[in-house]
Amino acid sequence: IITEFYTKGMYSVLANTTGAGFTVQTQQERGYAYQHFVLGLLESGNCVGWHWFRYQDNDPTAKGADPSNLDSNKGLIDNEYNLYKPLADAMKELNINAYRLADWFDQQSNNNQ
């Protein structure tokens, strides 16, 4: 299972100076990055699951937070509970097709043997 992956978007109010994830310009590009990464997992044939690292962006005012979790756009929602709709839509588009995609990749792999 793949855990704690994310892509940060510069189109947010956060500086994105912490955390190890990739950085892209827009929330739509975050969605494309999610799709690209998960398609690779499905194609590999050896991944049983995955989950996005954070539900909500890092809170830059959080006391005692780990230094890697201070000011980055890692969530599906911002700190005012607004959904990053382009990201969520891209996730939904892939997730509702995950089993069909896994089957398709399996068939392609079997056809190439």
Task: Give the positions of each predicted feature.
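Active-site clefts of carbohydrate-active enzymes
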Residues: 1-36, 53
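Short, flexible coil/linker segments at or flanking structured domains
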Residues: 35-38, 64
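Acidic-histidine catalytic/liganding microenvironments
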Residues: 44
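Conserved, mostly hydrophobic/aromatic
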Residues: 50
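Aromatic-rich peripheral "rim/lid" segments of glycoside hydrolase catalytic domains that contact
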Residues: 53-113
